[in-house]
Amino acid sequence: MFRTLTVVPLLALGLSLSACADLGQPTVRADLLDQTGKVTGTATFSPSPIGTRVSIEVSGLKAGPHGLHIHENPNCNPGPDAQGQTIPFGAAGGHFDPGASHNHDGPHARNDQGHGGDLPMITVGEDGKGRLNFDTNRLKMTGPTGVLGRSIVIHADADDYQTNPAGNSGGRERCGVFQAIN
């Protein structure tokens, strides 16, 4: 009887700790800048029991859905697009693609089927404010699928989740570089 009472709680503790293994990851945040350099929101990625909790708040955008993506480079300066023209936040580079899929896809595709950086759209209200919260197991804060040392970009238009390279989601409206906050 004593062994059963001892083993069962220890087994439950071990299972709960293994489910929280990713909770050792740092929390990272990006201040979202507009094209003038003004901070207009934040994107925070933090550990959650299923992987990563994503929380985004932004203001000053037109009403409606906006494409949202993790980009390769930790740089929000102007830079060249695929055609070599300088665009706002172009130095952020292309979409983060840890699975080397070379394919724009929806936010629920596996990393080997679509860019790991393709996120759900953020919807902005008539007041110009948007908020998005979700959990994902496709991205972490560090490691091969980590966002630390990368950027996040909010685009001008909705993402069609199929057109390469950016889902036909228009220009880059907001950008932020992820930094560890703990």
Curated annotation (Swiss-Prot):
User: What GO cellular component is one of the record's annotations?
Assistant: plasma membrane
Q: Which SUPFAM superfamilies match?
A: Cu,Zn superoxide dismutase-like
Which chemical reaction does it catalyze?
Answer: 2 superoxide + 2 H(+) = H2O2 + O2
Lipid attachment (S-diacylglycerol cysteine) is at: 20
A GO molecular function annotation here is: copper ion binding
Cysteine pairs forming cystine bridges in this chain are 76-175
Signal peptide location in the record?
Answer: 1-19
EC number from the UniProt entry: 1.15.1.1
Its name, as the record gives it, is Superoxide dismutase [Cu-Zn]
Organism of derivation: Deinococcus radiodurans (strain ATCC 13939 / DSM 20539 / JCM 16871 / CCUG 27074 / LMG 4051 / NBRC 15346 / NCIMB 9279 / VKM B-1422 / R1)
